[in-house]
Curated annotation (Swiss-Prot):
The lineage of its organism: Bacteria, Bacillati, Bacillota, Bacilli, Bacillales. Keywords: Aspartyl protease, Cell membrane, Hydrolase, Membrane, Protease, Transmembrane, Transmembrane helix. It comes from Bacillus anthracis. The keyword Transmembrane applies. Pathway: Protein modification; lipoprotein biosynthesis (signal peptide cleavage). It catalyses: Release of signal peptides from bacterial membrane prolipoproteins. Hydrolyzes -Xaa-Yaa-Zaa-|-(S,diacylglyceryl)Cys-, in which Xaa is hydrophobic (preferably Leu), and Yaa (Ala or Ser) and Zaa (Gly or Ala) have small, neutral side chains. This is Lipoprotein signal peptidase. One of its GO terms (biological process) is proteolysis. The keyword Membrane applies. The gene is lspA. Belongs to the peptidase A8 family. PROSITE patterns: SPASE_II. It comes from the Bacteria.
Length: 152
């Protein structure tokens, strides 16, 4: 199924990018891409977004396995008839597994995309995080559009 290919693509790009960061950058160093907007910054996270639940690896292992099983089940049941849902779930699955790999093999997640949005120093993130967020946003958009169609 194409949605699993999307997940594998996300995992591959995520892991390759993280490997490049670990091998080529000292922890804490930063390379400006667009001054005051976008940087590549070598960072590690032992928790979830914004460092929430730091050092609770077993919690993340269990939650991720349950979540991945749920996503695969949901993909098998609903993605056959809904392409956008399948793409969204493929992105979410790839992102979840990408960060899970880091937690299992590194006991931390490698983050490196550092963005300043209107001078707000946004937490450093990675490709897996981006895929998760894009997948969730697509599901929200689809849900809103379907709700609008139902009302009409």
């Amino acid at each position: 199924m194409i949605y699993y290919v999307i997940a594998l693509f996300v995992i591959a790009i995520d892991q390759i990018s993280k490997w490049l960061i670990v091998k080529n950058m000292e922890l804490g160093t930063s390379i400006p891409i667009i001054d005051n907007v976008l940087y590549i910054t070598s960072h590690r996270n032992r928790g979830a977004a914004w460092g929430i639940l730091e050092n609770k690896m077993w919690f993340f292992y269990i939650i991720t396995v349950v979540f991945v099983v749920f996503i695969v089940f949901y993909m098998k049941k609903y993605a056959k008839t809904d392409k956008l849902l399948g793409i969204s779930l493929g992105l979410i699955l790839g992102g979840a597994i990408g960060n899970f790999i880091d937690r299992v093999f590194r006991q931390e997640v490698v983050d490196f995309i550092h963005v300043y949005i209107f001078s707000y120093n946004y937490p450093v993130f990675n490709i897996a995080d981006s895929a998760l967020c894009i997948g969730v946003v697509l599901i929200i958009i689809q849900t809103l559009l379907e709700g609008k169609k139902t009302k009409e």
